[in-house]
């Protein structure tokens, strides 16, 4: 039986931290499906710069990812219900409340575990592992 993992996020301006998260998520199962957040659902930080379809295409091109979709406009759990994964892998710094996610999964009858990926430490002094910091650097140098 295939062990399906879902990862999710905004993935605006892909960086090594995103790749680390998705590689760890892929290692949690046999198949990794990624849900890319719609701009309308991003309310915990600045809205993404790149369109959702573009972010999905870039994520889908990664070797660790089997498929990527854009999330539902109104119900962020709708794709999870449709996929019925074995694991939901969260990034180490994602704002989600693990207990609230588990409660909603139980309420909807979705039997899966919620796991957190580890943080990736910079491998070089100048490595940037944050979309916000990449944007800040661009504005600093080109703004």
Swiss-Prot record:
This is FAD synthase. Keywords: ATP-binding, FAD, Flavoprotein, FMN, Nucleotide-binding, Nucleotidyltransferase, Transferase. Catalyzes the transfer of the AMP portion of ATP to flavin mononucleotide (FMN) to produce flavin adenine dinucleotide (FAD) coenzyme. Pfam families: CTP_transf_like. Homodimer. It comes from Haloterrigena turkmenica (strain ATCC 51198 / DSM 5511 / JCM 9101 / NCIMB 13204 / VKM B-1734 / 4k). The gene is ribL. Gene3D superfamilies: HUPs. Pathway: Cofactor biosynthesis; FAD biosynthesis; FAD from FMN: step 1/1.
